[in-house]
Design a protein with these regions (language model features):
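Bacterial N-terminal signal peptides that target proteins for export
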Residues: 2-15
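A short, well-structured edge-of-sheet supersecondary motif
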Residues: 27-47
Length: 215
C-alpha cells in the first residue's frame, strides 16, 4: 500500500466510523478530488472534482468487502465458510498476511484482515472463494457497482493493485461507503477494529484514527 492509497483508505474508513463520509485523493495528474457527505442523508457538504476519475488503490477493498457481505446476505456462503489460500493468493505483494498455500481462513477472519491489514493475499482468497476467480469476482464487483449507481467505476481485481481500466471516483466511493453502512448495520463492527492478533504479532489498523476519534 502506498502512502497515497493509505491516506485514501483512512479517509473512507473514518467516514464509516463517524457518520460523515470524507473522501480525498490525488490522481495521477495531481488534481485534488474531495468529497464530504452526510452518511445518513447523502447530502453533499463539500465537493471538489468529485466525479474526476482516479485510481482507487486499496480503497478497492471496500467493494471487496461489500461484494462479500452481499454474498453472505444472499446465503451463498457464511461468515464461517473456509477460504483456501491458493498459490496465486500467496504470491500477492506487497502487503499481505503471508499464509502458506493450502491454509484456509474463515470469511469472518478474512474480512477482519482485509479491513485492518489491507492484505492483498486475503483479498485474492476472498475473490477466488466468492467469485471462483479474480475475473469472476470482478464481474460481481462491477455488477454491484452498476446496481448502486457507481457509473464512473470499473474494477479489475479485489485488492487495488495497479491494473489498466481499474478506476473510480470520490463520488462513487461515497455511494459505496453509504451502502456499506445502510445495507449491513449488523456488520458495523468490521469498520471499528483497531488491531488483530496473528500468532504472537499484533497488527494495528492503518486507520490510526480508530479508538482516537469520537464516533
Amino acid at each position: 500500500m502506498t502512502g497515497r492509497s493509505n491516506r485514501c483508505c483512512r479517509a473512507v474508513i473514518l467516514g464509516l466510523t463517524v457518520g460523515v463520509l470524507a473522501l480525498a485523493a490525488t490522481d495521477r495528474a495531481n488534481a485534488e478530488a474531495q468529497l464530504l457527505i452526510e452518511a445518513s442523508t447523502g447530502k453533499v457538504l463539500h465537493a471538489e472534482n468529485a466525479t474526476y476519475p482516479w485510481y482507487p488503490a486499496s480503497v478497492t477493498k471496500l467493494m471487496t468487502a461489500y461484494t462479500t457481505l452481499r454474498a453472505v446476505k444472499e446465503g451463498r456462503l457464511s461468515l464461517n465458510t473456509l477460504l483456501p489460500i491458493s498459490r496465486n493468493a500467496a504470491a500477492q505483494q506487497p502487503t499481505k498476511m503471508g499464509f502458506k498455500v493450502g491454509a484456509a481462513v474463515t470469511v469472518d477472519n478474512a474480512l477482519k484482515m482485509l479491513m485492518v491489514k489491507s492484505a492483498n493475499d486475503i483479498a485474492v482468497a476472498i475473490a477466488e472463494g466468492v467469485g471462483g476467480s479474480i475475473a469472476g469476482f470482478a464481474d460481481l464487483m462491477n455488477a454491484n457497482a452498476r446496481r448502486l449507481g457507481m457509473s464512473q467505476s470499473n474494477f479489475v481485481n479485489p485488492n487495488g493493485l495497479p491494473a489498466e481500466n481499474h478506476i473510480s471516483s470520490a463520488r462513487d466511493l461515497g455511494i459505496l461507503a453509504r451502502a456499506l453502512i445502510r445495507e449491513f448495520p449488523e456488520y458495523d463492527s468490521y469498520w471499528h477494529i483497531s488491531s488483530i492478533r496473528y500468532g504472537n504479532r499484533v497488527m494495528r489498523n492503518y486507520n490510526s484514527l480508530i479508538d482516537r476519534y469520537p464516533g
